[in-house]
Each structure stands twice: as structure tokens, then as C-alpha cells.
UniProtKB/Swiss-Prot annotation:
PROSITE patterns from the UniProt entry: PNP_UDP_1
UniProt xrefs under Pfam families: PNP_UDP_1 (PF01048)
Catalysed conversion reaction: a purine D-ribonucleoside + phosphate = a purine nucleobase + alpha-D-ribose 1-phosphate; a purine 2'-deoxy-D-ribonucleoside + phosphate = a purine nucleobase + 2-deoxy-alpha-D-ribose 1-phosphate
HAMAP family per UniProt: Pur_nucleosid_phosp
Binding positions (a purine D-ribonucleoside): 4, 180-182, 204-205
Coiled-coil residue spans: none
Chain sites annotated for binding phosphate: 20, 24, 43, 87-90
Protein name as catalogued: Purine nucleoside phosphorylase DeoD-type
SUPFAM superfamilies given in the database record: Purine and uridine phosphorylases
Keywords, alphabetical: Glycosyltransferase, Transferase
EC identifiers of the protein: 2.4.2.1
Keyword Glycosyltransferase recorded: yes
Family to which this protein belongs: Belongs to the PNP/UDP phosphorylase family.
Length: 235
């Protein structure tokens, strides 16, 4: 067991999907995994292990934001020796040609989070995805006939901000595709520990147009994203 995960050694696979919403973790396990077993419910953050196409895979909720995902990624790697980690989550689009329900592969993750500045003593480290996972995810999406978007996302520490329009316009000018709250931490920690990581994101709302999905959709749909992530992580 670790501080925030109640699993025993051997109960977590070395390949794991990381949704922020623990109810999405439950949905993924019950919908896509064979014989899923609950290994964690500490703080309501459900974690399951099962098999997908004959390969052992886990799924663990992480909560929202850099501090929360950092706790789970650190413990999954240090206490359970997880090798491959794929975040499956939602994001808000800031490019006009990115649509609600599009799937984005986050090649890099710009951020306003202080975490990396504290770690790197003011240096602006550029967290990026693992290339092998990125390529495999792109190929998996193409095989499904999907039009994937690949590029930079913005990991924000702030969901509500007074100068949001100004920040969004600046980020869009520099070709950032969407805004989310976790990928920078995932990529930085994966680099630190020599692990493979990727964020596969579904656009749940469009910050410019105002189009959005429902809370129920965000919990229990977006199956394209989940299948891409699962097919990628077992390669």
C-alpha cells in the first residue's frame, strides 16, 4: 500500500489508464476490461485491474489538477513500478477548427503551474509525450477512421480566471489546441522516472463557441478516446 492507494503489491498492472474522474475509471473498467477487480477506493478514487485483449491493464482515477495527479503518478511509479501511463481526460478547445468531441493527442504541455518552476529553479522545462506512445495512438486512431488532432495543450492551475479571454487568445495565437489541468505533471514525472506517458483527450467543450457536452457524457461516453488509449497501451 501507498499513502493514497490501497492496493497490495501485484494488484496494479504495469500499464495504466488515468482518468481524472473516478466514475470514468469505473466506467472504463466495467465497459472495456474483462474480469475487472477493484483494488482502490481510498478517498473515492477508484482503481481497477482487469484484462484488455488478453493484456493486464489497470485504470486509476487521479482527481483534478497538477497536485492531485502528481500524488497518484508518484505513488504508482514509486510504490507499484508502473511503466506506461496514459491520461484519458477532457479539455476545452481554443482553436476554431477543433470541434467538440474531437480527440487530441497532447504532444506537449505548456503550463502556468508553479510545480515545474519549483522543481527546475525557474527554468521553463518543456514536458512532452513519449514518442512511441504518441505514434501508436495516432496509428490506432487512423485505423478507427478518426481525424485526430496532435499538438500542444495548456495545463492550467486555474479553472476560473479573471483574464481568461486574454490568456486564451494568446495561447491560440501560438497554436495551442486546448486547455486542461494535468498533462504537464504527468509528462514531467514520467521523464523524471524514465517512464512512458501520453495524454489522450476528448474536447468536452469549446471555449470560443460555447458548445459543450453534458456531465453524463463526460463520465460515460467518449469511447473513441478510451479505445485508442487501451489499444495503445498494450502495444
Amino acid at each position: 500500500m501507498s499513502v493514497h492507494i490501497g492496493a497490495k503489491q501485484g494488484e496494479i498492472a504495469d500499464k495504466i489508464l488515468l482518468p481524472g474522474d473516478p466514475l470514468r475509471a469505473k466506467y472504463i473498467a466495467e465497459t472495456f476490461l474483462e474480469e475487472p477487480k477493484l483494488y482502490n477506493e481510498v478517498r473515492g478514487m477508484y482503481g481497477y485491474t482487469g484484462t484488455y485483449k488478453g493484456e493486464r491493464v489497470s485504470v486509476q482515477g487521479t482527481g483534478m489538477g497538477v497536485p492531485s495527479i502528481s500524488i497518484y503518478v508518484n505513488e504508482l511509479i514509486q510504490s507499484y513500478d508502473v511503466k506506461k501511463l496514459i491520461r484519458v481526460g477532457t479539455c476545452g478547445a481554443i482553436q476554431k477548427d477543433v470541434n467538440v468531441r474531437d480527440v487530441i493527442l497532447a504532444q506537449g504541455a505548456t503550463t502556468d503551474s508553479q510545480m515545474n518552476r519549483l522543481i527546475f529553479n525557474g527554468i521553463d522545462y518543456a514536458p512532452i509525450a513519449d514518442f512511441e506512445l504518441l505514434k501508436n495512438a495516432y496509428d490506432a486512431g487512423v485505423d478507427k477512421g478518426l481525424h485526430l488532432r496532435v499538438g500542444n495543450v495548456f495545463t492550467s492551475d486555474t479553472f476560473y480566471r479573471d483574464n481568461a479571454q486574454q490568456v486564451n487568445e494568446l495561447l491560440a495565437k501560438y497554436q495551442v489546441l486546448a486547455i486542461e489541468m494535468e498533462s504537464t505533471a504527468l509528462y514531467t514525472l514520467a521523464a523524471k522516472y524514465g517512464r512512458q506517458a501520453l495524454s489522450v483527450l476528448t474536447v468536452s467543450d469549446h471555449i470560443i463557441t460555447g458548445e459543450e457536452t453534458t456531465a453524463e457524457e463526460r463520465q460515460t461516453t467518449f469511447n473513441d478516446m478510451m479505445e485508442i488509449a487501451l489499444d495503445t497501451i498494450i502495444k
